[in-house]
Amino acid sequence: MDDDNLDELVAHSPGPDGPPQVGSSELASDAEESSNGHSEDSEDDTGSEQDDDTDGEETEGLSEEEDPEDRSGSEDSEDGIEVPTAAVETQRKLEASSTPNSDDDAESCPICLNAFRDQAVGTPETCAHYFCLDCIIEWSRNANSCPVDRTIFKCICIRAQFNGKILKKIPVENTRACEDEEAEEEDPTFCEVCGRSDREDRLLLCDGCDAGYHMECLDPPLQEVPVDEWFCPECAVPGVDPTHDAAPVSDEEVSLLLADVVPTTSRLRPRVGRTRAIARTRQSERVRATVNRNRISSARRVQHVPRYLMSSLLDETIEAVATGLSTAVYQRPLTPRVPAKRKRKAGRRKKVLGRKKTRSRSSVKSKSGGTRAKKRQHRVRRTKGRKLKNEVTARSRIARTLGLRRPVRGTSMPSVYKPVDPSLGLMRADIGAASLSLFGDPYALDPFDSNGEQSADPPSPLSAKRRVLSRSALQSHQPVARPVAMGLARRQLPAVAPEPSVEEAPVPDLLGSILCGQSLLMMSSADVVIHRDGSLSAKRAAPVSLQRNSVTQSREESRLRDNLQPGALPSESVSGGLIGDRRPNSGLSCGDRTALRCLPAQIVQTPVRSDSSVTPRSGLSGNLSDESRPKWKHSNSPRLNGSNVRVGSASTKTMTHSNFPSKNIAPGHPQKTDPRRPDFSKLPRIPKIRRDGSNSTQDQAPASGQTVELPSACISRLTGREGPGQPGRGRADSEPSSRGPQETGSHTSGSRPPAPSSHGNLAPLGPSRGKGIGSSFESFRINIPGNTAHCSQLSSPGFCNTFRPVDSKVQRKENPSPLFSIKKPKQLKSEIYDPFDPTGSDSSPPSSSPESLGSGLLPSEITRTISINSPKAPAFQTVRCVTSYRVESVFGTEMDPDPQPPGEPVSGMLELLGKGPAEGASDLEQEGLGEIEPTEIQGSSARAQRPSPPDPWDDEDGVSCTPFFGSEERTVTCVTVEEPSVPSPDAPQITTHRIVEFRASSRSRSTSSSRSRKKTKKKKKVAREHQRTRSSTRSGSRDRTSRSVSPFTEEHTKRHRAKTKSRRSSSDRASSQDRAKRRKDRDREHRRGPWGHGRCWRKSRSRSGSPGSSSCERHESRRRKRRHSGSRSRGRDGSPHSSLERDRRHKHRERSRERMDKKESMTRSRERRRWRSRSPSVEHRTRRPHSREKHPHSPEKKGAVREVSPAPAPQGEPRQDGDHSTKPPVSEVSVLPEVVSVLPEVVVADLNPPEVPPVLAESVSCVPEDLDYGDSVEAGHVFEDFSNEAIFIQLDDMSSPPSPESTDSSPERDFLPNPILPPASLPQNSTLPVTQREVLPIHSEDISKPAPQPLAPSDQCLLRQDTVETTATTLSTPGVLPMGKDSPLLSGRGCEVVRPKDAVAPAPLLRSRTLVKRVTWNLQEAEASTPALDRDPRTPLQRPQRPQEGDWDAEDRALIGFQQAPFSELPPPIHVLQESGLPDADPSQPPGVPRAEGPPAVGTLHSAGGILAQVYSPNMPPPLAQPSSIPPYALVNQPSVQLILQGTLPLASCGAAQNLAPVPTMPATASELAVPTTNNSEERTATPKTAAEKTKKEEYMKKLHMQERAVEEVKLAIKPFYQKREVTKEEYKDILRKAVQKICHSKSGEINPVKVANLVKAYVDKYRHMRKHKKTEAGEEPPTQGAET
């Protein structure tokens, strides 16, 4: 009867489908044949609802057959029929009216413990206890007492839902007979005491051993059936439960029990800690088993659901589906249920070997096919049924072969299921049937033959579902079977579900797999391979990565794991390395199948260690990451390619620089990958990468490239930064970019740097650096954003790549030849490669070894550098402040990666110093140089050491230097990171400033790539610096603006910077001659430089005294600059040495651009401001337009800067004067991005007190960075990209410089008018502010120092003069300013603002800041100084420019952020204010001026002429007046800027800070912020900025907004052409500039998109035409046209 009963019950309701059975089958049968043999057949019927008609007939036959078969069949059948009929009718009603009450928390059936969902509910008539209809019916078959309270009931009330009204009452079946029969059939459970098996409702089952005990037979008889777990006397000890349970149970069951940690196997056991609703008695267990069987059989229909679908995530869904199929809706999937029934019957069949089984089979058959069912309706059906069951139809065979299963209920698509082929026990466990052991027959549910077994296997998936459905029921009631099933299913599911069971190693990482899948999906179809099984793998990475993955991935992954860990350990980014490397294997080439496989895990960890992990990925030469990683930290060479190939980089201190250390080593060397990873290295990956770009950056980094390629593409796509046309490149580039940013994260953490190094090793060297070189990545767009995670591992190269990829397009275009040799500087010098000339950039990146990573990383992820400076400053804790400053470094510097490293070790600043001249020094000098620079500068030993390439730091720094300094101009974004571990006496808390070098100008790529790209950018920067030497202030300002622009802006800026870089690349190309000249000049300078390492030194010099390199080097570089070219920085800045270059540039560009600059300076500044104001907004378009606009303006700004170039000349003179005081240095700083060099000279001059020079050096560093605003813009993009990452917060610090975007265009524009005039006076003022500003970020950690810093505020000169220490401190303080310290993370911009304030003693910092700000405003003229200022406090630069209304929005946003940060710092600013106030009035006094000018500078910035004039005369009043006019934007930003820029200048900063404090808390409008700031500024000094100024500003803002709109429209219109490469970046910028100008000057004052599109198209056609005739002409023409326009 058990079988019969079960069948009936199943049919009626007990089956998992029980209620559904009753509902579906019985309802169906009821409807069709209200009284067919519903008892047994209703189940069949239910089972085969689809065959309702046939089933109906079958049901009749079956009923007849079954009734005879099942002893209790007749009774049950009749009862069942009634019950089913009622149930069926009810079910129909239920189905019609049932609404899902599927709350797991909802009431649940005490029997099955399943929550009442939509299943029909039955309640005994005598009580209000609710049970699943099938459960209570099944229960009633055994006992007519309520399972809960044991009250006798004669009828079951059927309700549609819990608490639903009674739809019908069905009489309780006479279950006694059934029970007896069942007991006989089944191995009965006998009371251990009395030996009887009756009174099952009182026969308690031990939860431990399943032994039966009658309640009365227990020693103290139980009056109530225990609802909770009950253990027999023997199992009284819970610990024994599992054993006991296992003992009687089959081995499989035992295993299941063991698997089920919970010892109780009681099915009644509440799920999830819920107490049993009813006692676990033999009856309850029988009922539960029956219900379970029924449901399982139902579920079995669903069993074909792929096991992987059974995974936990799908559990709920499956549960819902299964529930619907089984108990939930009481609608048994007809077909599936029958098979389940069949199995169930088979199980019973074992017990009742008779017709029951046959019947079951027949029923199954009927279920199988309606037609067959009809045939089977007769006895034949019975026999046939059995056969059918075992019989394999063609369809079933095909389906089985294909793994197709009947669709899960609710789905119309057949589910694909790949049987796991588990043992019956496992299947049972999956199903949760293991608890059948309770019944004594573990195989009761598995009566089938092997065929049935197979079914069982599928059932297991279904079981999983069932389990999921009734997980509570199965788990609670049969924890043994169910939990095990769940566990097994899940365990198996992972193995089976993910078809790649082998791949399962990563452990199913849902998120990772999703991300990987997404990345694959995002990849261009060309890069994805669709396998027969439907799986996707990345084809692009496949060549290397995939190939390697396929062949060696498993092996390599394991090896990577092993290696990685070793490498990772050395790298400190074990996890990053481990996962990073292993994943880099797979994850990095996300496209790789393996990568995909690993990606899941990878991805999961990627977010955390995407920096590290991705880096290895990127350099899929995980070995490099693995082996190399441990090494490269210590040795740069290994970084190349995943192998420890020094890739010819050994000579290049920046082994990674040998992304191919030297471009010479181009692709071939990268293949030198670690012996371990010969696969990757030797893979043709590099060629592939190479094809990505003429610069075979990727080629060079075979592993890296490939990994980069795929992940880049994926990331690219995900980031959306990759141009459609450049999937491969963009991907590779993107990945590095992404890695770069991630590297930042890794670098940020002490351990991370190594990982990024490893990545840098792989991808950075290969792809990242290679990218820079090969510019094979077009993902400069994606540059830093999406791939940040991946790039992270690219660490040094990675970050370089990040920016470089931005550059890479241009590089690709212009640097087809792999200029990977470290000698790249020479190449750069001789070659006028694309502004993105990858050669320079790449050269530098390769030079920067993974150690150099820090420096290299920074470019890619501005913050990354800091973290990468792990060897020296492994303690890069957080990027406090990311300030970008433009550094003009001689390309020679690129080749000079070595010089810095020696000093680098000294400066825990790691790459910051490594970036030393360009970035490292900047960072270190800002943070470390400010603190450590004095040490380093004073103890030039660091710098002296720097020449030694071996030093890891040296390498890194050198690399930094190389990439950053390699670039002619590089916007060095100083990411201030608290770097407790920095060994710097002067900088107790050396906030490591990651100096992200964004190549200014065309090199705006991301700073991430900066290293790798920076070199590339360097070429661009060389040209740009040429441009920017003229328009350095402008460029720097622009870059700064970009950088300063809000974090979002920065992010976008990164993106845009990539674009901008492309554009700049074009303009740089246009000025390629200038650039080439400049490079040559720089190279000469560099060569002249005492250091043979033209790269680092040159960087350092280029970078204005190599502020970024290291303090010592900076000073030395400054001195050398002086020696060599009167000032290399000048040479770069257009100072003495760059005099020729500058003259050339000025002549070449100023002529064409002076007009353009003057005319467009305002327009561009407005446009840029507009863009910037937009850019601060998250709008990518806005930012992009900002960048683009910026870029188009860049040439103009460059022109303007060039105009200022004469100013730089004057500044150069001041530079010469710089020796005598800070003023000259300031002038120098102010002069240009090259001013960085100037500043170093100034510092050199100030170097007399070595400490002061450090400050200057820091300032210089800042200056270069800020100066490189073009880069800054791209840096902004980088930041933008970074914004996605934790680092981005730090980048937000840089974002404080996001203002740079605004400042960039504004200052440049504003300055353009009077840029040349103020340079001399402003530069001086600027210098101090610059220094201070740099200090701010540098000392962001040293908040405590701010108080000590008052000196600096009092007088920057003092800072330089009397306080090398103080200066260092002041610098440190500025660096430490809250901006650097807590703000950075808290609010990117706000942080920076705060840092400058707090870090710098309110007075000193603010004062410096003020100066800085003034410098910023003077940025165009005193670009060097301003960049320095901007660099440290990114906002300063931004703000200075922001004040130029165009930037106000972005500036405001940045300011708000900064202002928020400054709140805490307000008091110090006040202090500063007072101090500032004193010097403020004194325009002649550089320190005072900065203070006075800080606010005025802001104001002045708004009005170019006014600003310049004000800057000229640092009279507080005029500047303040301007701030008043500028308040909405400039003021708000300016206060922050002032806070940061005027870190030393208390007045401006203080007032700004104070006003800002309240405003910052709430993102007050720019005007609000500006107003308070203005007021403070006015308080500090007679605020010249009056209503007139404000009105003027408002008008300007209107124009700016219009310009922004115009820019947006133009960009939208030109975008397609640019994407199609119909226009070069330069042309893009020119067209953008011209079109915007034309649109803005249109009389209608309206912006008609159609007209804009036509205009743009006309321009595009014009340029195309011009290009045909003369490409160079076209390149130069844009500036001219811009000037004309």
UniProtKB/Swiss-Prot annotation:
Entries under CDD domains matching the protein: mRING-HC-C3HC3D_PHRF1 (cd16635), PHD_PHRF1 (cd15536)
Disordered as annotated region, ranges: 1-82, 333-390, 449-483, 537-590, 606-777, 809-860, 892-1229, 1290-1355, 1369-1390, 1421-1448, 1466-1501, 1569-1591
Polar residues bias (residue ranges): 606-625, 637-662, 694-709, 737-751
Coiled coil, from the record: 1589-1615
Basic and acidic residues bias spans: 671-682, 1065-1075, 1130-1143, 1151-1165, 1192-1201, 1577-1591
Zinc finger (PHD-type) residue numbers: 188-238
Protein name, UniProt field: PHD and RING finger domain-containing protein 1
